């Protein structure tokens, strides 16, 4: 007598294993206990931390701030950047360098007012219960300004941790100046060379009054990053979350670089509509594997990359023609679908209808019986993210769910949307992190493949891709277009896909 299949019990909000190193805070408000914890038994009910950036212009402060916020959000820790420059631009949108001269009384008044407004909004943000960690992004270049911030935060019951980026590497400073003159809102629409000269003059004004953090501020909590992490000085860390931020900072570098992402070539399981497994690539997947080196040359030129794959055959087969060093990571293996491994979505819906529905309702937290959730994948990917931040130019060939999680980290995409992103086969993605956003580019192999994207409630078998052919083989998305389209980048959620793209120089929304 045939036995009924085992019941697949959803574990929608089950926390990760007890040895997981990350705080778990993304629990719906109605299910939160009176005493909040961060998943490690550390009380966070009253935890409010202001990370105060310190340093001269062109030292990567805004890039560091944006990375920290993205990292914390990726780990379900609510965080927000309060950029004093944005407040200042309300009254002075395009100031010249003279505005930052300390002898300019009106400029000094407006800059102090901007700092006041940013700190006030930050305190209100904490009081409204919207987050746990705020980043105050500004030069905060004098001891007097830092002490003022410390006193304001202390009066509001907010811990402070100062993060100073101190850099004397002229090549890196010039690289940052080059980026600022082309991406900073202060110089939008201006001649790049005139913008660079004005920005250098601004730096000189700050250099006149700049005071690095030293023993005079030994009572403060701070992390001092010298020459892009070549030396790190840590003083008076107080709690777990501060140590998590410092751990991340110690793995950062702010040198210009890019990350390339690609799924494996189409697999035989893709053709059959099955999930998981360790299938070989199909004939069309083999064509993509042979085409991939050409796409990489188009996007990277003569640059030497390191290729990371999972340990599964389809990624190793896809990467085998690439003329670079290759490393296989178990952490890059596809999301483990447990007892559903090797099934189609139609079979999962037929055998486990309640569980099929439960996963659609909370795809990020739902864990397959004997398998993983997207949250679990994020946890095992943290070492990968740290290695990516320490490395320079990496090409990752891996799987749909894993790429969704990595892409969400770099683009700051929400947990609600990242599991529903469409990551097409036979496409190379290049991400270039910058201070004011991540530039995304795509190269299309134009080799047919099935679409493995599934909408909520759908159990349809994988079909040939129905997405329109791009006008060219190359698309670019710049940070300025984020406000016009989907903030989650090109890998949009299909429901209400609103992309702002630049296709071969032609803007499209």
Predicted regions and their residues:
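Phosphate-coordination/substrate-recognition cap region in phosphate-metabolizing enzymes
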Residues: 138, 143-147, 152, 157-183, ...
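N-terminal pre-Walker A segment at the start of P-loop NTPase domains
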Residues: 17-37
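A glycine- and Lys/Arg-enriched "phosphate-lid" helix/loop adjacent to the NTP-binding pocket
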Residues: 97-109, 152-212
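Conserved substrate/cofactor phosphate-moiety recognition/catalytic segment
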Residues: 62-123, 130, 169-173
């Amino acid at each position: 007598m045939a036995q009924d299949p085992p019941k697949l019990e959803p574990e929608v909000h089950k926390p990760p294993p007890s040895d997981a190193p990350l705080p778990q805070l993304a629990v719906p408000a109605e299910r939160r206990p009176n005493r909040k914890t961060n998943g490690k038994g550390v009380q966070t009910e009253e935890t409010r931390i202001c990370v105060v950036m310190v340093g001269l212009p062109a030292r990567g402060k805004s890039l560091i701030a944006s990375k920290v916020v993205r990292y914390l959000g990726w780990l379900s820790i609510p965080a927000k950047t309060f950029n004093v420059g944005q407040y200042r631009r309300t009254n002075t949108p395009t100031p010249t360098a003279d505005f930052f001269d300390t002898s300019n009384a009106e400029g000094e008044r407006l800059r102090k007012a901007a700092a006041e407004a940013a700190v006030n909004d930050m305190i209100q943000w904490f009081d409204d219960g919207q987050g746990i960690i705020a980043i105050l992004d500004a030069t905060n270049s004098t001891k007097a300004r830092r002490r003022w911030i410390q006193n304001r935060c202390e009066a509001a019951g907010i811990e402070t941790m100062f993060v100073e980026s101190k850099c004397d590497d002229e090549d890196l400073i010039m690289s940052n100046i080059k980026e600022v003159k082309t991406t900073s809102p202060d110089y939008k629409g201006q001649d790049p060379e005139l913008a660079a000269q004005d920005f250098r003059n601004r730096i000189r004004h700050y250099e006149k009054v700049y005071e690095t953090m030293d023993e005079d501020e030994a009572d403060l909590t701070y992390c001092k990053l010298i020459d892009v992490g070549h030396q790190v000085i840590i003083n008076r860390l107080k709690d777990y979350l501060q140590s998590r931020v410092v751990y991340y900072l110690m793995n950062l570098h702010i040198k210009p670089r890019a990350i390339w992402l690609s799924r494996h070539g189409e697999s035989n399981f893709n053709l059959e509509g099955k999930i998981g497994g360790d299938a070989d690539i199909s004939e069309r997947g083999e064509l993509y594997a042979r085409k991939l080196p050409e796409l990489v040359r188009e996007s990277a030129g003569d640059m030497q990359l390191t290729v990371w794959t999972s340990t599964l055959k389809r990624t190793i087969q896809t990467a085998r023609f690439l003329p670079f060093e290759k490393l296989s990571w178990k952490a890059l293996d596809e999301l483990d679908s447990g007892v559903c491994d090797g099934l189609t979505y139609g079979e999962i819906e037929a055998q486990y209808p309640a569980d099929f529905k439960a996963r659609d309702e909370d795809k990020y937290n739902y864990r397959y019986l004997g398998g993983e959730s997207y949250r679990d994948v994020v946890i095992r990917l943290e070492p990968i993210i740290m290695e990516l931040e320490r490395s320079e130019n990496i090409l990752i060939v891996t799987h749909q769910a894993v790429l969704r999680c990595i892409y969400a980290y770099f683009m700051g995409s929400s947990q609600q949307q990242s599991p529903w992103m469409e990551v097409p086969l036979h496409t190379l993605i290049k991400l270039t992190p910058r201070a004011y956003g991540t530039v995304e580019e795509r190269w299309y192999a134009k080799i047919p493949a099935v679409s493995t994207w599934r909408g909520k409630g759908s159990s349809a078998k994988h079909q040939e891709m129905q997405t329109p052919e791009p006008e060219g083989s190359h698309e670019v998305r710049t940070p300025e277009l984020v406000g016009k389209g989907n903030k989650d980048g090109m890998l949009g959620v299909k429901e209400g896909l609103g992309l702002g793209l630049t296709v071969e120089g032609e803007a499209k929304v």
